[in-house]
């Protein structure tokens, strides 16, 4: 149907009509003093329903489909989809039986998991974490807005309100109860508020956005709130509705228990057999506006909300029991608000939940309000939609509301579904209300207004009611007949957020236009698509003359065929202007029939008619006649008619909604351009062109013009000095037009042809723009005297006559004489427009004559994304070419006011957006949860639930394992991946079989723990094996995923056949007395070869051995007293067997390698008793194999309890220390010599910035004669004025800006100077970056690496920030150089050392930073290897002591023997008497600190806390006094762990933000240094960070402070202190750099990982063994053999994989096969585009890179901050180019990234 603002289509239903209720039955309210009259319509206080949409069970995906289902009495109930409850069947062994007894029928969507995530720019990962209710609401809201004719994008930034009813948290429970797999986005993804907030977020709405939970009344309450928001002026538009999704069984079980649900899962409203309701799911959304606004906007007003009310039913018989009186009162309140007599209400849509109590109660309330007082035979009709689509609970009210609106709108009472016998508990005879049992026409006279009531109630007591009525002012009119439509062509628009969707939209529209759409005019369809639909970034447009033409062209789009009058493209990039430049060309566009079509256009005809009298008066001919006849016999007439056609075309364009934002005129076209820009009236322009044309008669035949393929500048040089010929028009970078005397022009043409240069005569006999025309200047000035009143242009106007194209010179008569004589500088004008960001050009002429020149200029300027089009073309229909040009510009993003072109009615039923759904459902991996089905980790086996198998000889144990359920207590990493120890697998075999004899055990593939696995242990006659596969994801078939066999073996039933052997322990020890090994020999050996941790906590307490045999006394639980029970199942053999496999592997210690068991010939257990806590291991070399041993496990008397027979090891490829050993964890900076580049950096100019004149003078002297210029500035601020000078050296690429902080003469001013130096450098960088200057920044510091002076300490923070600047702004950063001889300018180093952020010159040699293992020559003697550990008799102080990391340090120190601690913090703890209350409050932020302190005290430690802000300069005496007051033994160790993390980018850093971060680091360290002078402490540990070494973006301040700590530690070492700065990586879940998804991704992008608490303190212990001032604690990731490193500092510690095997678990969007980058630029672009899209697809977990739009913003595709970091890593790995962290900020799309990589890789 087609709708004007005052029209709707009537419906001919062909149904019977009951008696009229009449208007004479109105009566007053039963409230004293209040009456309801028949109030007049007040558009200001009424709310209109302008749009509706729904998605409901039974395929009811629109209100119209719902209406048809209601009329057809369809019941959409059915079985719940099987996948919904599947996770709950696995969660508890009791669940299956209970769930089988729970109602499984209801009203379900076929695919509630489906969502068009890409449409909304949501990544698959985030979509999976979004409640289906949020997804449904997004899509249905979009549909409702389109139904309302409101382009969703048009609401952006508006105060549109969103109120959505929601109260199901099924999906939230599903996700958030899966504790190990909870992720950050699940919070908002499953919150109630996420439903409305998602809508507001994606549509950029700024009005109220609220989730409404009033149980089953929620959505009608939401409609009430929306109405109020509009009437109170909060919002102009309200999006209201409700949603429900049934994702879990919990609430269904509750409702079953409460008796609310029907066992059949069906609703039987008002029926005798109603015993409860069937739950339903779906969404319903309604769009509301103030009535006056809707009328103003020409909206289709479907109904009016006259009034609404919400209340509560108070204290009833039970909170869920209904209250008829409350239902009556809320209805009366709604009627009072509406000013409506209840007797005028013809229909009530009831809540009608089909419950035995609910239906009778509700009918009695409806009867009391609407039935009382009605005459017999005139009842109020009642019905309910629930039997059709179920009870949607939070969405129920909105669904009932939609049904009521449809009934009012269509004037029909629809029949009630599932009604066989009326409920006998209701007195229908006296009720005055009647259930609709057959379809009825709405009764009444012509003047009666149709009204309906809507009821909705919540089981918590909320009652709500709404009154709606038809919009009676809308006139009824029949469907428009298309046969009367004018045959003019129309533009039909399509759009989509991704290119591939255009075909989907085209197919939908083509199908509809070919069928139902034939009943709509093509104009109404065009109006809808242009003015009532949103316009996405990918656009298509067709010019169609009729329906068949439209269908054909749309089909061509579907089939990918190019067709005339069809255009499609993406809008210009967001960084480009969408403004349109109108280009008015000059002479040469004319053709005979150029005005034939134009004169049919009323706008064109009227424009020419208005100017024709001027032409006739001035020229003596009729312009109308000449245009109609095609009479262009002379150049003079062409001049005039060209102007008129251009002015007429401009008028047509404006009438069709296109306006210029900039204008260029070419030659005579400048006159029309000035008119279009508003400088002249059309009449003034006509006077100029006619009077000048008359003067041209004097020079007719005097000359000629020729277009030549030679650049204008070159032609000027060639013709220099000649007067007969001039270069007259600069057409394009490769061509120009020459004007002059005819003979000279002809001669030039012949000459050019002889030289092979193309030359083309221009059809004219007047030498335009030649000096000979200057003779006409004075006559023209006289002729135009007093005729012009030029004004300033309303839009940008570029001149082609003036030398400066941006000249604002008045368009007076002097301008027009210059225009006649001067050269035409078109190229310069186009270039100026391009420089101003313009990319869309429209040639306004009868034929394109400069479009090619404009394109050529654009390409010459390197612009690739642009459009040049034209209004007309020779022999093409003008109406279509004009529309086509507008369509092309629209498709590129130009603004078109479509309502000017299409002001008529719009068609309501044009299809809505076509969705491209994909399933997104979180598959839960953690089940089973029940202890009866999951393996017991304390038994150290993988035996889970035993599954019966047909036959008697096979049994299968199944379980699932992840890092939370690994069957061993410790850690067992191998090459960075944790695996199950072999001992746990053998133990599994023993317990699964019950055997004591195993044989032929083959350990094929380790069982990895990195991802959740399904495990099977299969036991058959005498065989056993362990198999696994990765736990299957959602959507995978049951049989998908390969099973991998890890370990196989054989077993024998019965006990041991041999008696246990007896070993002579004493004799073995005596034999090996001279070969005593350290107790920790095995642990240290394994640590060095790469086994950094043990799966079990055994310890060797006595060890002897040679290469042939070993004996070791082992305690499997050294921390457990002998009298205490073990912390695991006592029957487990795994702990002692793990010691056996581990110690056994060390027998070959002369060939240190990483080895693991590969095969065990036999395992024998000789005892039925549990293994002992303490026993002996005897290892013998097996004679039959080089790498095989026998291991006997015996008690302390030598009785053998178990034995490994011939255990063979295999060597594992890898680097010692590569998988988590302390050697791979702890590093130190080394400074190897730098490698000089073969291509030095060009530096010809140096700008020195230094406040120290002496330093500046020294460096200037050193630079003399080595560079072209030296500029000295006192401060960075001076750079600003210099940068604004276009001629300054700062505009040159060969300029280096060098900052030199001055010396410091007093240590007291270190904090102030450090802050000053830092801010100076940051200001300097900001000026260069913000000014887009091509220069590079360098910094020279004075021996900071030696850290022996106050100057060095003050300058040290610069060493930290420098790497951050390099990371954030790599193109502007040159480098930091720490010089050893101040005054000697390191120019050669700056030029030749280019791949280092920081450089140190030592011994005259430039050196670069590399991390390397701690040097062996710094290893302390064994007696001193506890240099960083506490002594019981001393006191230890920790700053930041109440922070998470500080508390962990406290626990570690107590574990290592400390008994007195002082925890320093800025905050004071409350008195001890309050601790109990605080600890009882689980939400208290203090509770963790108090709990830790109490735990430490329980271990025998004394803990004091001091509230001292050590960042304060006067903190030293305060701290000293506070420590003395405690009367403790001397403080012998200090850990400075205080700090503030305030992530800010370099460009955002402020003085205050920097100081806030620096103070705890710098001032804090200096305060501690004052309180504890050198040599006063056993150790002084400063907690720094590795961020300043690797260049983490956003850490400018933090890196600076930590760099100071590094230097301070070195300085204290020089003074004899045992000081060390530890540059930590992120601690997992601890401290300021606690691991988050973002931090982990950032670490990975730098090639490192985080560490655990245990690893951190193992590193501490390791550092304690060395005499060093700094240590970096981090672990390298494993890189492919040829993979580039993300930062060179890792070069010497990076772990390289031994091959390049791809992971079996890689995402489906795998990278394309790598090949060489092509040579040509276009091929390179394609090559890069493919690879970058692959990377984005992998990060987003998309199935194909085809789903990645190169032009779309990465953020719109769903790339969040965490994914951005991952993307950088993918790009670096794929393309081998170092990617700065800020790249995606400056390059927000794939296309931008292609350009960046093209430049980088091209260099």
Swiss-Prot record:
Q: What happens when the gene is disrupted?
A: Abolishes the production of terreic acid.
Which residues does the annotated region (C-terminal hotdog fold) include? 1073-1218
**S-S bonds:** none
Q: Which domain of life is it from?
A: Eukaryota
Region of interest (Required for catalytic activity), ranges: 1783-1803
Query: Is rRNA-binding a UniProt keyword of this protein?
Result: no
Q: What is the effect of changing residue 972 to A?
A: Abolishes 6-MSA production. Does not produce lactone
Q: Which residues carry this modification: O-(pantetheine 4'-phosphoryl)serine?
A: 1761
The yes or no answer to whether the keyword Isomerase is present is no
Domain (PKS/mFAS DH): residue spans on this chain: 940-1218
GO MF annotations, alphabetized: 3-oxoacyl-[acyl-carrier-protein] synthase activity; 6-methylsalicylic acid synthase activity; fatty acid synthase activity; oxidoreductase activity; phosphopantetheine binding
Question: Which EC class heads this enzyme's classification?
Answer: transferase
One family name in Pfam for this protein: PKS_DH_N
Positions of the region N-terminal hotdog fold?
940-1058
**E.C. number(s) listed in UniProt:** 2.3.1.165
The GO annotation for biological process reads: fatty acid biosynthetic process; secondary metabolite biosynthetic process
Q: Where is the Carrier domain positioned along the sequence?
A: 1726-1801
Where in the numbering of this chain does the Malonyl-CoA:ACP transacylase (MAT) domain appear? 581-894
Could you tell me which residues belong to the region Required for homotetramer formation? 1141-1262
Q: In which pathway does it act?
A: Secondary metabolite biosynthesis
Domain annotation Ketoreductase (KR): ranges: 1434-1628
Under catalytic activity, the entry for this protein gives: 3 malonyl-CoA + acetyl-CoA + NADPH + 3 H(+) = 6-methylsalicylate + 3 CO2 + NADP(+) + 4 CoA + H2O
Q: How does it assemble?
A: Homotetramer.
Q: What does this protein do?
A: 6-methylsalicylic acid synthase; part of the gene cluster that mediates the biosynthesis of terreic acid, a quinone epoxide inhibitor of Bruton's tyrosine kinase. The first step of the pathway is the synthesis of 6-methylsalicylic acid (6-MSA) by the 6-methylsalicylic acid synthase atX. In the biosynthesis of 6-MSA, atX utilizes one acetyl-CoA and three malonyl-CoAs as its substrates and catalyzes a series of programmed reactions including Claisen condensation, reduction, aldol cyclization, and the hydrolytic cleavage that yields 6-MSA.
What PANTHER family does this protein's entry cite? FATTY ACID SYNTHASE, SYNTHASE, PUTATIVE (JCVI)-RELATED
Name of the featured protein: 6-methylsalicylic acid synthase
